[in-house]
């Protein structure tokens, strides 16, 4: 299934150092696969995968001191986390894309999982790796 494939790719980039080019290759591959299968953006629970991917891409940009890209990727990560929360509160939903159009996802059991956006913002505020961008206006805007 798509979840298992994303999980495998996710493990490949999650446990690699941000400076490792294989981390970026795996994250980009997972993102490309999700976007190819779900081109309409109705990602439902795959929003959390996309949030994690963009968080990793931000880490990769930080490692190369590309702070503009890092903040842009963190904004995307936060946007996907917020979309995941919106999907969770809506109950049962259906994918609209051709490949997954016969699948649905029932969020009724996942409503107690918490706030993905809040968790992401906590990680950003607690982790020292974000110190180089912490004082930027665009980084601070993530908390607005």
Task: Give residue spans per PLM region.
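Alpha-helical protein-protein interaction modules
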Residues: 1-136, 140-144
């Amino acid at each position: 299934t798509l979840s298992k494939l994303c999980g495998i790719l996710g493990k490949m980039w999650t446990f690699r150092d941000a400076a490792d080019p294989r981390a970026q290759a795996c994250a980009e591959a997972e993102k490309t696969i999700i976007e190819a299968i779900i081109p309409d953006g109705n990602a439902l629970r795959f929003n959390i995968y996309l949030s994690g991917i963009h968080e990793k891409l931000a880490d990769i940009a930080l490692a190369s001191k590309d702070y503009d890209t890092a903040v842009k990727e963190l904004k995307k990560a936060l946007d996907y986390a917020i979309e995941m929360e919106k999907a969770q509160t809506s109950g049962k939903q259906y994918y609209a894309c051709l490949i997954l159009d016969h699948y649905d996802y029932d969020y009724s059991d996942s409503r107690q999982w918490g706030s993905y956006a809040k968790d992401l913002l906590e990680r950003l505020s607690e982790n020292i790796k974000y110190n180089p961008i912490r004082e930027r206006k665009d980084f601070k805007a993530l908390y607005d």
